[in-house]
A protein has these predicted regions:
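Acidic, small/polar-enriched beta strand-loop surface segments
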Residues: 1-32, 195, 199, 217-265, ...
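Surface-exposed cap/loop segments at beta↔alpha junctions
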Residues: 2-3, 8, 67-168, 364-368, ...
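Short coil-to-beta transition motif at edge beta-strands of beta-rich domains
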Residues: 73-93, 290-295, 468-482
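Short coil-to-beta-strand transition motifs
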Residues: 94-105, 342-344, 480-495
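Exposed extracellular interaction/assembly regions and N-terminal maturation sites
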Residues: 263-319, 357-362
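Acidic, glycine/polar-enriched metal-coordinating patches/loops
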Residues: 302-367
């Protein structure tokens, strides 16, 4: 939720004595206001998480004044209402209450209780994801749901939202199509479908901002302004926790993706002018070259530049087709790199249609999608790198250097290289990883996971005075306090990732990470 603070808002942060209020506006499904309740906050919690499906959850106990209509409502009346919740702050010197929106919510299990004897209202609620993930609704009835290969991902997300009458949305997905049929059994939730669509490519996030569904890239915050600098934040911090969970440090990440089957294997392959010609038996009666068909072969010679493939069967010649191995951010196909397919290795390519319905060939990899990334002070190159690929039994092997002074991802001078702390492996396979269907996507995921697990020194958690309008994925300034005795730290920029506001004490815990351009492959592309 976006909020631009004023000088009055910032001055209010430093007031020692404050009274906290809650305003609960009841709305029907058409977003029409039904009633509004207001009272003094006794205690409660607002949790905001950038990594959770339900981004915002809210619980509170509020003393409601005697003149109210809350006693007229029973638990069933709250089931078909939205709650727009605001927190108000008042100080002895102020002549008004400063109100800040906490978002739009639905009541969850045992989420409404009212004690008329002491006028105490207790609420427990979640943001609108609760309507999609079966917290209160979201399951689909009837036949299984199928999203066909070739459908535009953005449009598929929008159509899925409309199954639950969600008509306010901002879907900023890359120009991509669904790479294979997605099937969902009866009883699947709308959120499960949205999640699988979102995760076809990395890295995207989904959440609700008030009643608007958002799907966009996880922000790198590179061009975002600092909402509060260290001069504002530092005096508000009560204590800091910068401890490292060393068991989570990893410097080698291996991804095992999908197993790739082939429709047609060719044992008769020739190579000339960076074109591979695949010949198939004339006796085959059901042979087809069309979208979604996969063709496999053993490479007779390594190609020295981008290459093509031609398919011959009977008197029919198909191609040559340029082989593409990925897609850039703008949705443009990227031709395969020189030397990507090695002599004597088995590979699979897949026929697909571009946006103009023309046939193209996509490089999938070997029979098993597999990639590995290693953090090293001395990455091998040339013949040494090729030997490392053989030793690791992984052709898609990448080393990240800790000695590159121009690196902006936080890996420069990392203390967690394999030379400094030994090799620490983490292997990802099965479950969602089986949906990673090309080596290129597996490498992107390996880069991301290795980057996350080798930057733990950049994470810090602080307890501080509550800032009711702070949100996750915002850039703030802060000066680290912990370290060796006498060690001085310079102010730095951090990105907020988790916020837990304690309404009873007027404090909050903020987990944040040191700011760097957010993903390694964004830097490269």
């Amino acid at each position: 939720m976006s909020y631009t603070p004023t000088q009055d808002d910032i001055r209010l942060l430093y007031q020692r004595s404050k009274k906290l209020y809650a305003k609960i506006t009841l709305l029907n499904w058409d977003m029409k206001t039904i009633d509004s309740l207001e009272g003094i906050v006794l205690d409660g919690n607002l949790s905001i998480s950038a990594s959770s499906d339900i981004r915002r959850t809210f619980t509170c106990n509020v003393h409601i004044g005697g003149r109210n209509n809350v006693s007229a409502y029973n638990v069933y009346d709250w089931l078909n209402k939205y709650l727009r919740i605001s927190i108000g702050e008042e100080t002895p010197r102020a002549d008004k209450i400063y109100w800040y929106s906490m978002g739009l919510y639905v009541v969850t299990q045992n989420g409404f209780q009212y004690d008329a004897s002491n006028h105490k209202l207790s609420l427990s609620c979640s943001d609108l994801v609760g309507k999609l993930n079966d917290t209160i609704s979201g399951q689909l009835t009837g036949y299984a749901t199928v999203i066909k290969e070739g459908r535009d991902i953005r449009q598929s997300i929008i159509e899925t939202l409309k199954l639950m009458d969600i008509n306010k949305y901002m879907v900023e997905y890359w120009n991509r199509t669904v790479p294979y049929d997605l099937e969902f059994s009866t009883g699947a939730t709308v959120w499960q479908i949205l999640t699988e669509l979102r995760d076809l490519y990395y890295p995207f996030e989904m959440y609700f901002d008030e009643d608007t569904f958002i799907c966009k890239e996880i922000p790198d915050c590179k061009d975002d302004p600092v909402i509060l600098n260290h001069e504002v934040i530092d005096p508000l911090v009560i204590r800091e926790n910068a401890t490292i969970d060393e068991t989570e440090v990893r410097n080698c990440t291996e991804i095992w993706g999908a197993s790739i089957d082939s429709d047609w294997y060719s044992a008769d392959v020739s190579f000339s002018g960076n074109n591979y010609t695949l010949k198939y038996d004339d006796a085959l009666t059901d042979f087809e070259v069309k979208s979604n068909k996969k063709f496999s072969f053993v490479v007779p010679e390594t190609h020295t530049e981008g290459c093509t493939v031609t398919i011959v069967q009977k008197n029919n010649t198909y191609g040559p087709f340029t082989i593409y191995e990925g897609t850039d951010k703008d949705g443009n196909d990227v031709p395969i790199k020189a030397g990507r397919m090695l002599k004597g290795k088995y590979y699979v390519v897949k026929c697909y249609k571009d946006t103009e319905k023309n046939l193209r060939m996509q490089f999938l990899g070997q029979s098993q999608v597999h990639a590995m990334v290693i953090l090293s002070d001395n990455p091998p190159t040339g013949a040494a790198l090729e030997q490392a690929k053989k030793d690791e039994a992984c052709d898609v092997l990448e080393y990240i250097s800790t000695t590159n002074a121009s690196d902006t991802t936080g890996m420069y001078k990392s203390p967690f290289s394999i030379e400094k702390i030994g090799r620490r492996n983490r292997i990802y396979s099965g479950s969602d990883y089986e949906n990673i269907y090309t080596d290129d996507l597996a490498l992107q995921r390996a880069e991301y996971e290795n980057w996350k697990s080798s930057r733990l020194t950049d994470a810090v958690s602080v307890e501080m005075v509550m800032i009711p309008w702070m949100d996750v994925n915002q850039k703030i300034g802060y000066t680290i306090r912990s370290g060796r005795p006498g060690e001085k730290h310079e102010p730095a920029e951090f990105i907020t990732k988790e916020i837990s506001m304690q309404l009873g004490s007027g404090t909050m815990t903020v987990s944040m990470q040191r700011f760097y351009p957010y993903y390694p492959y964004i830097i490269k592309k």
